[in-house]
Amino acid sequence: GVDKPGCRYMFGGCVQDDDCCPHLGCKRKGLYCAWDGT
């Protein structure tokens, strides 16, 4: 994820990793942000 205004937090809706806040990635199957291991 990226540090930008409006980034999505854990379990926030997303389409791609860049929609999520830092250390989060978009889980394609559920279309929500989750911890990416960083």
Curated annotation (Swiss-Prot):
Disulfide bonds join 7-21, 14-26, 20-33. The modification Threonine amide is found at residue 38. One of its GO terms (cellular component) is extracellular region. Pfam families: Toxin_12 (PF07740). Expressed by the venom gland. Coiled coil: none annotated. Its main location: secreted. It comes from the Eukaryota. One of its GO terms (molecular function) is ion channel inhibitor activity. The keyword Secreted applies. The record marks 37-38 as: Responsible for the inhibition of BgNaV1 fast inactivation. Keywords: Amidation, Calcium channel impairing toxin, Disulfide bond, Ion channel impairing toxin, Knottin, Neurotoxin, Secreted, Toxin, Voltage-gated calcium channel impairing toxin, Voltage-gated sodium channel impairing toxin. It is found in: Secreted. Belongs to the neurotoxin 10 (Hwtx-1) family. 28 (Jztx-11) subfamily. The presence of a 'disulfide through disulfide knot' structurally defines this protein as a knottin. Possibly exists in two forms, due to cis-trans isomerization of Pro-5 or Pro-22. Paralytic toxin that inhibits insect voltage-gated sodium (Nav) and calcium (Cav) channels in P.americana (American cockroach) dorsal unpaired median (DUM) neurons, and inhibits the B.germanica (German cockroach) Nav channel (BgNaV1). Also shows a delay in fast inactivation when tested on BgNaV1. May act as a gating-modifier toxin on Nav and as a pore blocker on Cav. In vivo, reversibly paralyzes both L.cuprina (Australian sheep blowfly) and M.domestica (housefly), but does not affect larvae of H.armigera (cotton bollworms). This is Mu/omega-theraphotoxin-Mb1a. The lineage of its organism: Eukaryota, Metazoa, Ecdysozoa, Arthropoda, Chelicerata.
